[in-house]
Amino acid sequence: MSKLKNKKRHLEENEEEQLPIFDKDSGEDGHLDDGDEDPADLSDSEESVFSGLEDSGSDDEDDDEDDDEDDDDKDGSEEKSSDAEEDKADDDDGDLKLSAKDDVKPQVDSQNSKEKKKKKRKGKSVLKDGGEEDVASGRDEALKITSQVDEYDHDTSDEEDIRNTVGNIPMEWYKDYPHIGYDLDGKKIFKPIRNKDELDEFLDKMENPDYWRTVQDKMTGADIRLSDEQVDLVHRLQQGKFGDVNFNEYEPAVDFFSNEVMIHPVTNRPQDKRSFIPSLIEKEKVGKLVHAIKMGWIKPRRPKETTPQYYDLWAKEDPNSILGRHKMHVPAPKMKLPGHEESYNPPPEYLLSEEERLAWAAQDPEDRKLSFLPQKFSCLRAVPAFSRFIHERFERCLDLYLCPRQRKMRVNVNPEDLIPKLPKPKDLQPFPTTQSLVYRGHSSLVRSISVSPSGQWLVSGSDDCTVRFWEVSTARCLKTVQVGGAVKGVAWNPNPSICLVAVSYEDSVLLLNPALGDRLLCTATDQLISSYAEPEEVKEQPVQWLVSEGEGHEQGHRLVLKHPKAVRQVTWHAKGDYLACVLPDSSSSVQVLIHQVSKRRTQNPFRKSKGLVQCVSFHPVRPYFFVATQRYVRVYNLIKQELTKKLMANCKWISSMAIHPGGDNVICGSYDCRLAWFDLDLSTKPYKVLRHHKKALRSVSFHSHYPLLASGSDDGSVIVCHGMVYNDLLQNPLIVPVKVLKGHSITHDLGVLDVTFHPTQPWVFSSGADATIRLYT
């Protein structure tokens, strides 16, 4: 019975644990059955392998031998050992049969087992008689077979196939390099050549059936085709399922300790004997504690002292200490020590001149840097008594008991950390840096300038009642047109297909055809103006449209618009058909007029104007109209005819305004030396206020293509700033002053009166009170 039990146990263990050698042999041989197997089919190498395994021994065989020795007598030990060898051979045969297929249980053939036993005994005797060489050869062959099975075949790792050794870093660091990392040998891994354009990508998307499952490896830059298992895993994760297909998240739960009251206990183990007997260990501990109390080693705890519920706040204070009486005592600040200006014989540079004395007397007492005038005496005997001594002592006493004091914690801050980190100007090029040309010809203030859309011609208007046309590249005056008053503003039509210039002087707006450049363009402009047909019903308009004839027509005059009041500014719409004029007069409701040249119509967009209008401008893209008064900039929607936004400039008097080509940013210059930048998407208050100029700003301008803006001031300088507006709405505009351009001389306390940029080049023009126009490139 013991032998049968041992064999049965060996068969069960071999079913659970099989050697990889047998798995390999079974995969090659196919299904192994008792009826098909023949002992003669086994080769010598296989016999040597099995014999080597038998010689190595195992715990199971030792257990079998121990069981056989316990069951049988000592006299039959030889027979039992031979039976144990037969059991080993049977176990080996069982292993071969079980390795073929798990679900097929082998049947033991008695005849084949006897032949195998004989063969095993014969092989074993040969090993014993032949010596150690045959045993060693058998073991070597067994080791060769076992070495063919790699124990790491089933191990997986996320970084086995990664050839790039850069580590877990952002791969964007290598976007500007031709390589993407380094391999195990330290050599560069170059990026794959990607010369596909959008057409190739579209063809690949249409023709390649694996396009949808091809992804790019960020570590190597190569294209990887996802397998079906990986695609299935991605789909499952997108659907919120588990990655493992075989995982069942809804397995039935077995409530072992259910809410049902059971009759019998879960475990019916009887209680131990020690649960009924007092513990000896506790008895020893109690005895030690009693002995320690008797010896006085352990003393009882003292009762806690009961503290009163209400206590005296000043019970432990020293009444004689100053800090005890005045917890928040702050010493009075010491008086400032006298300087050189308070000396009876100060250095000459500390003595004020007559102009400085008058300026000091005109200032308020709170604004004066010194409360006295420095005086010089020949000797100390000549110094008179201080007349304001009692008054000064009285003010000191008032400061001591009336002015509150507080402690301020000083924080050591590096001043360089407070300065914003701005890029260097050389990294923001191109921008104008030097004065290249000076346009001379006017005899008075040049109040306004404008550049043609092609950038070849320049028009300027002056107080000498002339309008001059210049060639930009040579500074040559090509044409001079006389008008009937001081020119306040000029504006070249921004439409490149129309050659027309608007000039404002006194109460008139003159439309000129300069006849410069392409003759076909000039002729087409004249035909466009002359093709106007008067409507049958003529409505009353606030402006008279007059057609120029005779000598004026020969000089280029085409239309004259007579206004009821003086015109200060003219500006064109981006399409070139609408013209806006400003008539600053707070007593009248007609301060802004919009003219349509093609239909010769004029309309007043506002019933009443809130404040004195300074300047107006059209939005470059949208139907918005910007109106700047003294302190506010109002944005109107011309289609809905309503107020969209009201910008607060936080300055005393707005002088000029410019709109960014994108239309989302506005800059305003003021007479109180401020330049305010508005971000329409951010707030109605200025995003930044620049105070770089020392005197009033007269003009501001944006470049149509480059991120540049310029401001002209009465201090005779033009400051060029880099104003980058990003497409990302989360990133604020970058404003960096890059250059201060000087060249104009201050005349009658006036400096630069107007600035404008070249339409295509990073050049800026400026006109000043010195009757010159300067080009900076």
From Swiss-Prot:
Keywords: Nucleus, Repeat, Ribosome biogenesis, rRNA processing, WD repeat. It comes from the Eukaryota. Residues 115-125 have a biased composition (Basic residues). Residues 1-140 are annotated as: Disordered. Residues 22-33, 95-106, 126-140 have a biased composition (Basic and acidic residues). One of its GO terms (biological process) is maturation of 5.8S rRNA from tricistronic rRNA transcript (SSU-rRNA, 5.8S rRNA, LSU-rRNA). It is found in: Nucleus, Nucleolus; Nucleus, Nucleoplasm. GO terms for molecular function: ribonucleoprotein complex binding. InterPro entries: BOP1/Erb1, BOP1_N_dom, WD40/YVTN_repeat-like_dom_sf, WD40_repeat_CS, WD40_repeat_dom_sf, WD40_rpt. WD repeats lie at residues 441-480, 482-522, 562-605, 608-646, 649-688, 692-731, 747-777. GO terms for cellular component: nucleoplasm; PeBoW complex; preribosome, large subunit precursor. Residues 34-47, 56-76, 84-94 have a biased composition (Acidic residues). It holds the Pfam family BOP1NT. Belongs to the WD repeat BOP1/ERB1 family. Component of the PeBoW complex, which is required for maturation of 28S and 5.8S ribosomal RNAs and formation of the 60S ribosome. Component of the PeBoW complex, composed of bop1, pes1 and wdr12. The complex is held together by bop1, which interacts with pes1 via its N-terminal domain and with wdr12 via a high-affinity interaction between the seven-bladed beta-propeller domains of the 2 proteins. The PeBoW complex associates with the 66S pre-ribosome. This is Ribosome biogenesis protein bop1. The lineage of its organism: Eukaryota, Metazoa, Chordata, Craniata, Vertebrata.
